Amino acid sequence: MFFFGIEHEVAFLNHEGKFADFSCTKFADFQQIVDKLPLYPHDYPQLRVGDAGIKKKRWYIEGFERFADSEAVIDCVAKGIEIRTTINSTIQGAIDELTASFYLLRETAASFGFSPVLISFNPYTCVFEPQPPLNDFELRQLQAYPDEQTAHIYMVSYGPDLNISIADLPIENVIDIGKKLTYYSPFIVPFSYSSPFYNGSLWEGLSVRTFIRTGKRSATLVFVENQEHLIKSVPSLTKIARIPAEVGRIEFKACDSCDNFSIYAGLLALLKGLALDKTLEGRAIVPDTTLHQISAKAGFDHDDIFLNATKVLQAAENALENDPDIKFLAPLKDILANRKTKSHQLIEMFENLGSIEETIKRTYV
């Protein structure tokens, strides 16, 4: 039996129509929105709250936590608001919950002058530099956790975690699926491309987020229960589960954000199909940076990316032959047939409108 969940990062424009990032938005600006959103007590213990207490709801502020000289959080530099679903037994259930949570967030944010926009990489700021500079305690914390040393990337990028797990599957098999998804990631991610903006203008490709993050951030992360199942790698493939509900979870982290949630449904079905597939033999512990960067620039216009994406999609479709979830693959098949991603639409709109803000205002419609 499969289980599904989605974590979706939302960026905003403020009441002035400016992109609301850490340069002009405080933690309290976003927290006032989260404070107005409901708390569902039955969500726990499957949702992780975390030590700082920021992650109390289905919505929470995504950002960079600051410390004094102890583990007590004294501030959080905000980049946006994340929506997370509970664990669902169906893909449709996860999509329905995400959709309901998104509409509630949009309605609540509007009362404070914020409107959600589709962004997968900060269109103006390329690098996050903590101010004031990191203190000795913070530097020691980062040195202890190599993946946490990439704050300069995750604070300017926005993307989903697409989560699947399979009941009672031995952890060795779960890790093998994680290796498989890492290997085929360059051919999966173009279905989601939505980051064609960089440093105030158009980038020379379709996903600057993919181009910059690959090799430094995980493509897939598998949560394990015991230390002996950890595989040492940078970026990480495996991580110790922080709560029991995380054990055996596979998080696919490489995709750009989507404003059409049917693409998330398609991607979850694709991941499910690849987990079931017995024909594809590729495995990798760390993502192939070169292939991801080729993919990021050309997408499905690159013949190797297109052919391998076709192979991956076909393998998933074959594995789901008698599964009703096969229907969720339809949007991905359309994207592949046309070789057009969301980035293509955004580029065309930008060329017509001449403004990044005016372009992204037309997302989430």
Give residue spans per PLM region.
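Flexible glycine-rich active-site/ligand-binding loops centered on an Asp-His dyad
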Residues: 181-189
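Short, well-ordered, mixed-charge alpha-helical segments that flank or form enzyme active sites
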Residues: 124-129, 169-171, 190, 197-200
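An acidic/histidine-cluster motif and surrounding catalytic segment
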Residues: 162
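Short, glycine/charge-rich beta-strand/loop segments that flank catalytic centers
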Residues: 83-87, 114-130
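Inter-helical turn/loop segments and adjacent helix faces that build the functional surface
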Residues: 165-177, 189-194, 261
